[in-house]
């Protein structure tokens, strides 16, 4: 329920923001301020790396070691934030002011957006150890509260800029930054009050430091490369098509992110258990968690995405007063990409648990960087942004293959064949059958609203039934039956 409330607020906020900024300014914000979204992805990945070592020390019940681990990680991330600021204020600032296709009269506003994004991102990087501590203690409820609070605050600033007499783009970027800072402050206060190991000490764990630096370095390589790919596609679109298509990308990316967040809770819940499985050398349980987590994540994406993909034009029309050119088709492609991306997080979590992340990050990093050049050539030859996003979808499939290879290299008991056949192909076939049935149903009903409800009901029913009998294993089926019976029994009391 919390996710639906947060998503509903976020969708309505996007409508108000687009109305207040206009398509062109919204495109500028997505292009220049997009660094915030990508940096959030980067800090989430760094958080996973830091969580590994904190979870290890918590498992050993060594308070002093946990405190040294936290303080060492915090110092590393402060250094990374400083490095980020240096690069952003030199190379990044030059690129924004000389290379991007932005109207001269909006360049001042673009710089305000850029500087606000730098502040939010730098503080977000230093926040990583605190979020890792919350995750390692499995206090997921605090994330839920903050997510809803953040959504409400963003809705408030959307209305503020709608009726403000000031420059809407500048005001929006500043207020968005203020919200980010407030959330960071809240998390830190929460950690200081609940986890005594979060109190910083000026002691570097010299045994842990090289391990953390090495681990964070490889993580940084892979995720900086992914960030370069995501923002690179946005920049390429800007160079060829201008800020109007950037607005479409911004809308599509926001929908993609909001729907993908549904599996975030699944990934977060499985992560500590997978790491603990590796620590205890319980590889059978670890492999089971990777498999069942991948199934639940991908099935969840199908349940949400199929009706939206089929009725995207209708839903966009209800949502936005003005639909940016290209937003519908880009959004449909990105939602399909979400499905294939849903397999990757837990596979990478397992690789992270082993500590040997070098191969996965080197090869994925090379793939992502190479993909930027290929994307440029595709757009240059075809003069179509659609093919760029289709190719971007393919990179997710390649990355999944690299992660599976890397995991098999570290854990020989993990069966790539079983995972591909019984998880990826099984759920993909389930998705194709459900999508085909829903698409055929949509053709039979003329009314948009009734066809949306019909395909939602049919696809959901079909996915649940087929998943239960043909995708999930007997243990998972028994667990679900037990939970349903328990819920029904409780409901009749």
Describe every region a protein language model picked out.
Residues 119-149, 159, 332-367, 382:
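Membrane-interface junctions at transmembrane-helix termini in multi-pass inner-membrane proteins
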Residues 414-416, 435-493:
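Membrane-proximal transmembrane or re-entrant/amphipathic helices at the cytosolic face
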Residues 169-173, 187-230, 273, 281-288, ...:
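Interhelical loop/hinge segments that connect adjacent transmembrane helices in multipass membrane
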Residues 18-20, 24-25, 138-141, 149-185, ...:
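Membrane-interface helix-loop junctions in multi-pass transport and translocation proteins
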Residues 1-11, 175-191, 206-276, 296, ...:
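Transmembrane helical elements of multi-pass membrane transporters/channels
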Residues 44-60, 136, 195-196, 252, ...:
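Helix-loop junctions and terminal segments of transmembrane helices
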Residues 16-38, 69, 169-174, 208-216, ...:
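Interfacial/gating helices of multi-pass transporter permease domains
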